[in-house]
Every structure is written in structure tokens, then in C-alpha cells.
């Protein structure tokens, strides 16, 4: 039994060992005058990227032919876990590519940030495969501890320290709520395993009346609140704009991409597989509407790029929760397609922001001369913004179309209507980027330095997928359908 567990968990074990070796490497060479910053940080970045790519290969080689329960039923490997882990590792690899030159540009001697990004990726891999409330909570806490530190990693910046402190205080509060919910579920049912919980709740109507039912209801409500805080859904979004703005840009990019995949995957496992009940649909229905409306309206007033992207992220979480609210196979499939396309667009836009950071690009108005000084980058950013806005035939339109179609299929007409209206409103601030780049006369001309080769390659790949996704969406459809079936059958 132990041998099978070891083989199945070999990718995670490899990544943990690689992270520890990288930490030792960084500590040893940080005292050397020849190999210290800046070569050290870049070397750690490249080795970290290599570790992630090898982990992707190990996960791909060990593709599951059947469902496997590991470590006394605390973890599970199935098609849903497999594809989510590969997708998470690809998004982490994208972040590592973006950070190769970032620390040199910002004069940050912080190889520890790369090590912590890898460690949080390990925790997210375990989070995706968690099959027990205790295993899930431990994985979420390991991820959160890494995030608290990297949010405040720019030690000479008051904004970064403030961001880390805010995230720590509010994150600790949400983790406490999540743990309290898990303890209530255990107290009223006597089990923590997802499979056992699914058997208990099959055909069991949860209401506020009756001591046992109300206790279970409150427990699941607390778990839902803890999750919604982690994915920045309204009304638990308060921390996101300040933390996104104050954190180093590469950390903001990582916060926008990786946790969304792991937390949403975990939410699907918990609520669709174990606790599925129409009661939770109403909660996510409300959060979806609130997130879409606030994300669309609050972003209109923003002048800073990172703050606007934070509200954009909140709005997109609202769109993804449409699929969650449906509770159907089509809804889950549309949510998974939505996550994939959202991550592609977010990687793209942050790669551009990081490329322009060489000149301390901070405000949207700073884009004034981009169409004339770097027309290719301006076209790339325009395509991404049109995709964010949901302009056909780009990938962003396909994502929203499938989500709204799933909402109509399950009778959630109000959800689809509000989604369409907020999409139209969001066009204003996305297309404002294009207007500033092409039609505004800049007060001061900024000559942007050429982008490094790694980011150029990353941008080329993401823009290609965003632009031509509509021509051949079948592979993603097949993969997401398999993942949805794993949860529903």
C-alpha cells in the first residue's frame, strides 16, 4: 500500500525536495560576493522553473487510469485532480517565467520569494487532491502562510508591509471561520472524509429547523464563507484591492492566478460532491450577482492598473460562480472552461504590466504613447482587453457564452441577465485601455525598453490561444467534461 502511495505522490515529493534544495542553495550562495544578488536570484528562478517543468512531466507520466485513494483515504487521484494539477503547475511555470527579470528590475534581493512560491504550489497540489476536511485545511493553511510572507516581501516598501499585514489579519480570521465550520461538521456527523459525508448527505434535507440540521447548516455555511474569502468573492473581497496594489507585481500576478485554480477545485469537490444541496446554490447565486455588479462598477473609478485588475478579478470570480450556482454538469464544465481562459488572459496582462514596469508603469494614463513606441505590445494588450470584455470571437467571449448558456439551461435567467449587463458595463474600462493607447495624446512620452525573450515567448503563446481558441475548442471541452463527470458521478 505504501509503495503505491509513494509512486502516486512522487511529483509532490519531488517538488518539496527541489524546493528545500533550492532554499539551501540560496542560503549557501547568498554569503558569496561572486554569486550573490543579482545572479543568485536569477539562478534560483531558472532552477525553480526547471523544477516545476519536471513536476509537470512527472504528473503527466503518472496519469490515472482509475480513481485511487491515498494515505488512508485522505487524498484522491482521479481525472479531475490530474488535469487541475497540470493546469496549476503550468500557471506556476508562467509566473516563474515572469519573475526571472523582475527582481533585478526592482532591485529586490529576495530569492526566498521564489522558494515560497514553489512551497505554496506544493500545498496547492495537495489541496486539489484533498479528500478529507483535515487534509484540506492543512493544505490551505500552508498556502496561506506562504502568501502572508510573499505579500510583504518588498521590505523597503510601506505599501507591501501594509498589504502583508492586512492579508495576514483577515486571512487568519477567515481560516478560523473555515476551521470552525470543519469542526462543526465533524461534531454533528462524526466524519471528515468527503466520501463518507457524501453518503450521509445523499437524500438528506438540510434545514435550519432541528438541532442536528441547524448545526450542519452553520458548519457548511462557515466553510463556504472561508472559501469565498480566499477567492475574493463579494462580500468577502475587502482585502483584495489593497493587497493586490501593495504587493510586488509578480506576487499580485501569482495571487490572481494560482489560488483561483486550487480553491475553486477544492470548492467543487466539497460542495458539488459532498454537500450538494439547493441551499448552497442560493448562497453562491447571491455572491455571484454581488461580485459581478461590484467588480464592474468599482473598476470604472480606478486609475491605477493593479487596482483595476483587482476589481476585474472580483468581477470574473462572479462570472465563474455562475457555473457553480447551476450545480449541473454543464455548469461545472463552463466554470472549468472559464477558469482556464481567465488564467490565460491574466497571465497575458501581467506579463505586459511586468514588461512595462521597467519604467515604473503604474497608472493607466502612462500607456499614452505605447501604440507609437511599441505597436506590437499595444496590439497584444488590445487583444487581451477585448477578450476580457467578451468581444467575439476571442476566448473571453467563448468563456462568458458557455457560462451564460449553462445559467439559462438550469433556469437561472436573472443570473444570465445580470451577467450580460455587467459584461456590457465592463467594456467601458477595458476598452479605455485601447482608447488611451491609440487615441490620447500623452503629456510625457515614455520610451519602453524591449521585452526580454522569456516574456515575449509567454505572450506569444497566450495571445495565440486567446485569439484562435474559437477555431478548435474541442480538446478543452473533452477534458473539462471528463473533470465534471468525475465530480457528478
Swiss-Prot record:
It is a multi-pass membrane protein. The keyword DNA-binding does not apply. The chain crosses the membrane at residues 9-29, 47-67, 80-100, 114-134, 168-188, 216-236, 248-268, 280-300, 309-329, 335-355, 376-396, 401-421, 459-479. Its EC number is 7.1.1.2. It is found in: Mitochondrion inner membrane. It catalyses: a ubiquinone + NADH + 5 H(+)(in) = a ubiquinol + NAD(+) + 4 H(+)(out). It comes from the Eukaryota. It is an enzyme of class 7 (translocase). GO terms for molecular function: NADH dehydrogenase (ubiquinone) activity. Its main location: mitochondrion. The keyword Transmembrane helix applies. GO terms for biological process: ATP synthesis coupled electron transport. GO terms for cellular component: mitochondrial inner membrane. NCBIfam families: NDH_I_N. Core subunit of the mitochondrial membrane respiratory chain NADH dehydrogenase (Complex I) that is believed to belong to the minimal assembly required for catalysis. Complex I functions in the transfer of electrons from NADH to the respiratory chain. The immediate electron acceptor for the enzyme is believed to be ubiquinone. PANTHER family: NADH DEHYDROGENASE. Belongs to the complex I subunit 2 family. This is NADH-ubiquinone oxidoreductase chain 2. The gene is ND2.
